[in-house]
Each structure stands twice: as structure tokens, then as C-alpha cells.
Amino acid sequence: MNNVLQFGLQSSAIYVAKFLVVPLRSLRVGSSFVGVGVGTRSFNKRLMSNATAFSINNSKRKELKIPGAAIDQNCHQMGSDTDRDEMGTLQDDRKEIEAMTVQELRSTLRKLGVPVKGRKQELISTLRLHMDSNLPDQKETSSSTRSDSVTIKRKISNREEPTEDECTNSEAYDIEHGEKRVKQSTEKNLKAKVSAKAIAKEQKSLMRTGKQQIQSKEETSSTISSELLKTEEIISSPSQSEPWTVLAHKKPQKDWKAYNPKTMRPPPLPEGTKCVKVMTWNVNGLRGLLKFESFSALQLAQRENFDILCLQETKLQVKDVEEIKKTLIDGYDHSFWSCSVSKLGYSGTAIISRIKPLSVRYGTGLSGHDTEGRIVTAEFDSFYLINTYVPNSGDGLKRLSYRIEEWDRTLSNHIKELEKSKPVVLTGDLNCAHEEIDIFNPAGNKRSAGFTIEERQSFGANLLDKGFVDTFRKQHPGVVGYTYWGYRHGGRKTNKGWRLDYFLVSQSIAANVHDSYILPDINGSDHCPIGLILKL
């Protein structure tokens, strides 16, 4: 054996020491191959084609066919007892495997029918496991004299061989059935029950390599399944083009569903119905939006046909307003701009309308609250429209006390004063996700600006408890719909967002709201526009 290794079509016996995996760079690629190792490392590895016929003496060889490992019946042959010592020497030499690249390891494992997921060290461990599991131990050696060959086969219920993923998910060696069918090859047909626990224990011990202990396929599959069951986060199959249709929430209730404007908006009002259509949008810098290649103000106006557009965070200076007015779309001839004078290029609000308002007011009329350009109020025939950009509590919640103790109360008083004469529509970026349904990760943002318990309680006390109705939540009580996705973590692609933008209306006109909706497909800002159709 050490001197000569012959391959041919004769009926003479061939003792194949072991199916030895070698680096792909030292092999010629063929449809299938058998690597043969002998005692001396200088002996060349040879490739054999599937077309070559092997005649092997059944009385002097053993086949061990492992489910999930055999690709071709002509491959993966075990050697005779006399070759096992030589094979042990080769198995101890791991340098060739260590030198293989990830691509070579994966290619080799695929040829063996072994799953190839994982990093390089995991692939090396898997390959070693396959080699080790094919070496008969002392008990197998002593028992080999009593039986010519033993074949362990997977139970197959009248179907083809499963794919690699199926093998992993259904516990590759079918241990869950509690026994394995053992069939004697060629001469004798013996059935022996193999203890599933013993096999699992043996596999686990074989997989210990150095400081790492690789769990068996059965244990890995079980662990993955249990972890998937434990996770509280639900993100359904995402749509690349419409990620907002994905229910994305860390702790969703069983009756919640994702907002889909294509299926959740009511039919249009009958022609001739008197109504007004208002849109609002935090543009996060108007100049930047107008330069955004995929944005067209004209196309947006044509598509939505809104009557009034409210903008927040325009970040314009007073000197920029006249230039911007020249770029407005024809028909929207009435625009009103409030800019920050205390901090340039900051905050700012605007109302752009094709309906001429009866009057316009900037700010709240109280000193100390009107220097950042956060409020524009327009009076129309049947309602007041307030466009506001509520102050963010900031990093470290530095402005939290100012917001809840001063700003929120001032805004509430301003609204209630106007409501004495007409119903009020309050819109804009209110910088508060009021309930857990309004934010992807409520538990992780309890001390984040916009979701603190103080801000949420103030939102309720100063607005909702004063008789104002959250129109979107009234129309969609169990729907997860976001209007803001941070740039930092790419939340828009996975629909991990917040609902910060609102239309709140006086209780007296809440029944006149035909539709309160979100337009998540509109890009150009970290917020998206929202709309309101109000019957007059």
C-alpha cells in the first residue's frame, strides 16, 4: 500500500484509505473527485472522474455513508483496516486545511454536501469534523470483523434528497425520530437501532477543536429556533420598494398592522363635495429639498392637488424669503413665512396656499417664545389653521423643562383662545410620539427627546385633554404608521421610525375629517408629508 496505489477497471481490490479533503488550489477541477492519502506526504493526490468504474472487494472495505455528506455514490469511500494507521497520520496534519481560503473551504464543503455557512474558523472546524467523523473508532474496529459493511441512512418519506437548508432545519441526521435504520451493504440486510442520544454525544465530542466547541447541527438548529421564538421584535418580510408596509415594532400587539396608504385610504369624496385638502411636511431645510434630484414640487402638487401646504424647519433667513417666493408653483400665490432671528439658519415655518386667508398671525404674541419662527396662524372662513414646529427637548433633554412648562402651555392657551371664535386645525412637527404604537422601539427610548413620559403626559394634558382629536389615530386606532426615520441608522429602509407629525382638530369638526393619511413614499427629508381632507 505504501509503495503502489493502482487505479483501473480491473476487478482487483482497491483500498481507499480515506476521502481526504485537500486545498482546491492543488486539485484539478472535475465533475467529481476522490482524494487519496497515503503514509508519505510526498505522494501525489489524484483525481478520478465519475465515469471511472471502481471494483472494490466488499470483504476488505467499509463504507460509511453519512446523511447530508454524500453527493455521489462513487465518492466518500472508506479504507480497509490496514490503512487506518496511515490515515491517522494524515488526519493529524491540519496545515493543509488551515492554509485554505474561505472560498476553497466553502467549495470543498459543498462537494461533500456539508452546510457551508459561517466564518473561516467555523468552516475549518466543520471540515475537520467531517474528516474525524469518518474515522472509525476502536469500537468500530473491533466490531468490523463481525460485519462486512454498515450503512447509516436517513429516513426518507418518499421524496428526493433534501436541500442543504432542509437538512439543517430538519436536524440533519434525523435524530429526532429516536432511532436510525442500519442496513448491511451487499450480502446481509440487518436492521439495528442506533441510540440517538449516543450519536449526539459522540458528535459533540468529535467537534471539540482547540478552545472552541462547535455544537452539533441538531443543537444549532434547536438553538436558532428557540432564539427566533424568544425575540419580541416583529419585522415581516420587507418590501424593498415599500418598506412602510412592513409591521416594524419591538413589542407589537396582536391586532396591530402596518399602515399602507394604497389600501387604507377611503374612496374620494363625491364630485362637488366642498372640502379643503391640507398637507404638512418637516422639510429639514427647504434649500436642500429643492436641490434634491428626485424631488419635484410641481409633481407633488399635481399628484396630491393640495389646497394648503404647511412647512416646518425651513431653515431660511428673512433675506432668503423673497427669492424662494419666486420659485413657488403657479396658483399658490399666498405664502407666509416665519424665520428664526435668534439663531440664523434654524427652525422656521411657512404656510403656502392657493386660498387667500382672512388674516395671518406670526408667533403666539408672548415675548420669549416668538424669536425662533415656530408658529404661523392663518384664519380661513370656517377654521383657524396653526402650523407649528414644537421645540425638541434636545441632547441630554436640556430643553425639556422649557418645553413642557412653558412652550406646551403657551401653545395650548393660544389654541383655546382661537377656538372661542372658530374651530382649530393644529398641524406640524409636534416632536412627540404620544403612545408606544407611535415609535418602533419604545423601551429603548424612554429617556429620548420626543418620547419621555413628561413630554407624552404634556401632549395629553395640553392638547388631547383640552378637546383636540388626533385625526390619524382616530381613523386608524391599531395601525403602525411612522412619519420620521432618522438618517443615522437608515431607519427608513427598515421602517424603524417615529410618528411625530400630526393633524389635531377641534372636537366640533372631528366628524368632518374624511381622511387623515401619511405619504411615506415621498423622500427628500427625514420626515415624510402627511395630509388631511376636511369636509366644510
UniProtKB/Swiss-Prot annotation:
It comes from the Eukaryota. Keywords: Chloroplast, DNA damage, DNA repair, Hydrolase, Magnesium, Metal-binding, Plastid. Residues 97-131 form the SAP domain. The active site is at Y389, H527. The record marks H527 as: Interaction with DNA substrate. Expressed in the siliques, flowers, and stems. A high level expression is seen in the leaves. Expressed in both vegetative and reproductive organs. It is an enzyme of class 3 (hydrolase). Residues 129-168, 203-225 are annotated as: Disordered. Repairs oxidative DNA damages, also seems to act as a redox factor. Is multifunctional and may be involved both in DNA repair and in the regulation of transcription. Exhibits apurinic/apyrimidinic (AP) endonuclease activity. Catalyzes the conversion of 3'-phosphor-alpha,beta-unsaturated aldehyde (3'-PUA) to 3'-OH. May be involved in base excision repair in chloroplasts. According to a report, has a significant in vitro 3'-phosphatase activity. According to another report, has no in vitro 3'-phosphatase activity. Has a strong non-specific affinity to DNA. This is DNA-(apurinic or apyrimidinic site) endonuclease, chloroplastic. It comes from Arabidopsis thaliana. The lineage of its organism: Eukaryota, Viridiplantae, Streptophyta, Embryophyta, Tracheophyta.
